From Swiss-Prot:
It comes from Acinetobacter baumannii (strain SDF). The chain crosses the membrane at residues 4-24, 33-53, 67-87, 97-117. Fluoride-specific ion channel. Important for reducing fluoride concentration in the cell, thus reducing its toxicity. This is Fluoride-specific ion channel FluC. Pfam families: CRCB.
Length: 126
């Protein structure tokens, strides 16, 4: 009963720490589109794509899936931070930059999720 909760909790802690660290290091580089937020969403998309394909072909305990997907990726990626960054750009009249950021996050995340799936199938020889 407690293993699923512990799996999610541990994954969440690690994902949140990585998200915080990347935000600290990358967001100051290009504040108009904070690179930390972009990075965590793209990397999270890749990881979840790879993980979904992997776990679909794995006999591992479901707790590992909870650790990686629900815990780690759930805490690593961020829709709320993305949303406030877009609203802030819109409020400051930076419509073009807001549309660019939306495109990078949405299209990029979908591409990286597909790349994660493709990487698993390539590595696994499927």
């Amino acid at each position: 009963m407690y293993y699923p909760l512990l799996s999610i909790a541990l994954g969440s802690v690690l994902g949140a720490w990585l998200r915080w660290f990347l935000g600290l290091k990358l967001n100051p580089i290009y504040p108009q589109i904070p690179l930390g937020t972009v990075t965590v969403n793209l990397v999270g998309g890749f990881i979840i794509g790879f993980a979904m394909a992997y776990f679909a072909h794995s006999d591992l305990s479901p707790n590992y899936k909870l650790f990686v997907i629900t815990g780690f990726c759930g805490a690593l990626t961020t829709f709320s931070t993305f949303s406030i960054e877009i609203v802030t750009l819109l409020q400051s009249g930076k419509w073009g930059m807001a549309m660019l950021a939306i495109s990078i996050h949405l299209i990029g995340s979908l591409i990286f999720t597909c790349l994660g799936l493709a990487t698993y199938y390539w590595v696994a020889g499927h």
